Amino acid sequence: MLFSLALLFSPSQAAVFSVDLGSESLKVAVVNLKPGQSPISIAINEMSKRKSPALVSFNDGHRLLGEEAAGLAARYPQKVYSQTRDLLGKPYASAQKILNSMYLPFETKENFRGGMNLVADGGNENDSVYSPEELVAMVLGYAVNLAEFHAKIPIKDAVIAVPPYMGQAERRGLLAAAQLAGINVLSLINEHSGAALQYGIDKDFSNETRHVIFYDMGATSTYAALVYFSAYKGKEYGKSVSVNQFQVKDVRWNPELGGQHMELRLVEYFADQFNAQVGGGIDVRKFPKAMAKLKKQVKRTKEILSANTAAPISVESLHDDVDFR
């Protein structure tokens, strides 16, 4: 899909990049028009991975992004900011509900617009306050760095994929974040439209029409889109040609059903198991670091279950030096 997004436009510079920005992670693709370079490719991060954590962390006055921030998530859950895309354009109460449901122990306060600000560790200096737009801008800046390092040239033009349920307030927030990051957004495109373009770009529908359902379950949401593919007759350089086209017939989504919600079901189950194991009225949910450890291990277990019918789970020193197995 990223390839198709980047191909939608003819950039004024030598390259354009596209960003698939999710709640949990991001991917970056580059279309490079410079001679001798691969025209279309996925940018990899500092760990040689195609998918990067969409995370920002502030620790002792230092800012960390991506994989570096992910390395601190279990030790300092209150300092590693995730789900920032989902906080854009949200009223304070709605944004706080998202954080509470994910057991994210961030210090927050309501800003003058009725939205959320997050209070970050300023090290020896005073704590800093950031809006979701500013934090997303940092994540997008990280995406720019990945694209530019990959292409070996400066890139500022971008296409950003967004989920179909993202409203106008959220989209304005994302555009504001991109502007803060110095990105010239050529377009925001719905994820299912990008997927449909990717599917149909090299197919021939001159002799047939086709209905296709595109389904995606991400970290925090699920959607399905029904798309109709066909072709019409056109003219190119005076010759009759067949031109493919697609029409999105319908889209349905659930913004509260995703991989993280499955993980949270397991987290709740194992939290109850641990509470029963230690007794004494202890509730592990009240301890952010313990919950961060449990969430990390549950995610690993879920990934193992993707290819196996059973998987063990164990967390050393989950809380108060008590192991959980």
Per-region residue spans from a language model:
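Glycine-rich active-site/cofactor-binding loop and its immediate structural neighborhood
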Residues: 115-122
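Bacterial N-terminal signal peptides
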Residues: 1-6
